[in-house]
Design a protein with these regions (language model features):
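Short, non-helical or kinked segments that cap or interrupt transmembrane helices
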Residues: 35-42, 56-68, 105-113, 226-233, ...
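Membrane-embedded helical hairpins/re-entrant loop segments and their flanking transmembrane helices
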Residues: 2-13, 28-50, 175-245
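Membrane-embedded alpha-helical modules
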Residues: 75-150, 250-350
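Transmembrane helix boundary and interhelical junction motifs in multipass membrane proteins
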Residues: 20-26, 60-68, 185-187, 224-233, ...
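Transmembrane helix-boundary motif of multi-pass solute transporters/channels
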Residues: 13-76
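Intrinsically disordered, low-complexity non-transmembrane regions of multi-pass membrane transporters
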Residues: 1-12, 148-159, 193, 200, ...
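Long hydrophobic alpha-helical segments that form multi-pass transmembrane helix bundles
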Residues: 137-184
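Hydrophobic, membrane-inserted alpha-helices
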Residues: 21-27, 44-48, 65-70, 141-147, ...
C-alpha cells in the first residue's frame, strides 16, 4: 500500500465500524453476567490505543465471541469469565513463544471453524430472541429471573476460585481457541497483507498471538472483557476509511473516557434498560456471525459438517462437544477417501 496522507475524518468514521459487534457483546457481559462496566470499558480503550500504536494499522479489538456468547447464554460467573481470559492469555502467549499457531490451525480445518461460527451465531440469535420476547420487562428483571444472578457489578478480586478456573476450560476456552487461532491470528494476518501490502507485514501471527495473550492477561486480572483481534473487524474498519492506527486511538479514547466518566452509573442504567433492546442487538450480531458460514455450503460434505457442528452446538449448548463431533465426522469421511485413493493406486500398479 502506498503511503497516503492521514485523513482524520475518514479515520474517525472507520474507527466506529466495528461497534456493531463490540458493543452488544460488551453490554451483554455487563448486564447479564455482572462484569464491571468501568474497568471493562477502560481496559478496552487502553487495549485499542496500545494496539493501534503498536501495529500502526487499524487492527481491531473485539470481545471473544464464543466465550462471550456462551457466558451470556449460560449465565457464567464473573470469576469464570476472568478464568477464561487467563486461560486464553496463557495459551496465546505459549503459541506466540513457540510459533505453533500455524500448525494448530491444521488441527482445526476451516470447515470446523465455520461450523462453530454457525453455532455461535445461532446461540446469539436464541439468546437475543429470549430477551426480545420479554417485551415489557427491564433487563435486570430478566437476568435475575433467568440465571438467578444480580445485574450488578462483580467483585474486583485478583483471581477466580479454583473451581471457576477449571470450569472455564471446557465451557469457555476450548470452543474459543480454534476461532481465535483461525480468525483472530491467521485470517487477520491475511487481511493485513491484502489491505495494506508491505505495511501489513508488521502484523504477524506471532505478534497477534502475543498481543491477544497480553490483553487477556490484563482482562483476567482486572475483570475486563476477554478480547481478540479479528479479520471481520479489520475489514469493517478498512471499509469505512480507516487506514492507520489513528482509528484505533480514536475509538480507544472514546471507550476510555466513557469508562472513566460513566462507568460507575452504567450498570444501574443497563439494568433498567428494556430487555428487548439488548435482545435485538444480540440477534443482529448473531445473524452476521452465522452468515460467516455461508461459503462452506458450496460443497455437500462441508455443508453437512457445518450444519452438524452448528446444530449440535445450538441444541446442546456445548460447543466443545460440537467440535469433537465435527472432528470425528471429518475423520470418518477422510478414511473412505484415503482407502479409495489407495485402491486406485493398487489397481494402476497391476
Amino acid at each position: 500500500m502506498k503511503h497516503e496522507p492521514i485523513r482524520p475524518v475518514q479515520e474517525f468514521i472507520g474507527s466506529l465500524a466495528d461497534l456493531g459487534t463490540l458493543l452488544p457483546l460488551t453490554v451483554g457481559l455487563i448486564a447479564c453476567n455482572g462484569v464491571r462496566p468501568g474497568p471493562a470499558l477502560v481496559l478496552l480503550g487502553i487495549t485499542y490505543i496500545l494496539t493501534g500504536t503498536y501495529y500502526r494499522l487499524p487492527v481491531p479489538v473485539q470481545p471473544l465471541k464464543a466465550m462471550a456468547t456462551i457466558a451470556i447464554a449460560t449465565g457464567a460467573s464473573v470469576g469464570e469469565i476472568r478464568a477464561g481470559a487467563l486461560w486464553m492469555s496463557g495459551l496465546m502467549i505459549a503459541l506466540a513463544v513457540s510459533g505453533l499457531a500455524q500448525k494448530l490451525n491444521a488441527v482445526f480445518p476451516r470447515v470446523l471453524i465455520r461450523g462453530l461460527q454457525l453455532g455461535i451465531g445461532l446461540m446469539m440469535i436464541r439468546a437475543g430472541a429470549k430477551l426480545a420476547l420479554a417485551w415489557g420487562d427491564s433487563l435486570g428483571t430478566v437476568v435475575i429471573g433467568a440465571h438467578g444472578v444480580s445485574a450488578t457489578p462483580g467483585s474486583l478480586g485478583l483471581a477466580p476460585s479454583g473451581a471457576e478456573f477449571w470450569r472455564a476450560l471446557p465451557l469457555l476456552v476450548i470452543p474459543q481457541l480454534p476461532l481465535t487461532v483461525g480468525n483472530a491470528v491467521l485470517a487477520t494476518r491475511d487481511c493485513a497483507l491484502s489491505y495494506f501490502g508491505p505495511a501489513g507485514e508488521r502484523v504477524t501471527p506471532r505478534r497477534l498471538a502475543a498481543t491477544i495473550g497480553l490483553a487477556n492477561l490484563a482482562a483476567g486480572l482486572t475483570g475486563g472483557v476477554p478480547v481478540c483481534h479479528g479479520a471481520g473487524g479489520m475489514t469493517a474498519h478498512y471499509s469505512l476509511g480507516a487506514r492507520t492506527g489513528l482509528a484505533c486511538a480514536m475509538i480507544g479514547s472514546a471507550l476510555l473516557v466513557t469508562g472513566i466518566a460513566a462507568g460507575g452509573s452504567m450498570a444501574s442504567a443497563l439494568a433498567a434498560m428494556p430487555a428487548w433492546v439488548l435482545g435485538v442487538l444480540l440477534a443482529y450480531v448473531g445473524v452476521r456471525h452465522a452468515a460467516l458460514a455461508r461459503d462452506a455450503f458450496g460443497n455437500a460434505t462441508d455443508a453437512s459438517t457445518v450444519l452438524l457442528v452448528g446444530v449440535v452446538g445450538l441444541t446442546s449448548g456445548n460447543l466443545m462437544a460440537a467440535l469433537g463431533i465435527g472432528l470425528a465426522l471429518r475423520l470418518m469421511l477422510r478414511i473412505p477417501a484415503a482407502r479409495g485413493v489407495k485402491q486406485r493406486f493398487v489397481d494402476r500398479s497391476r
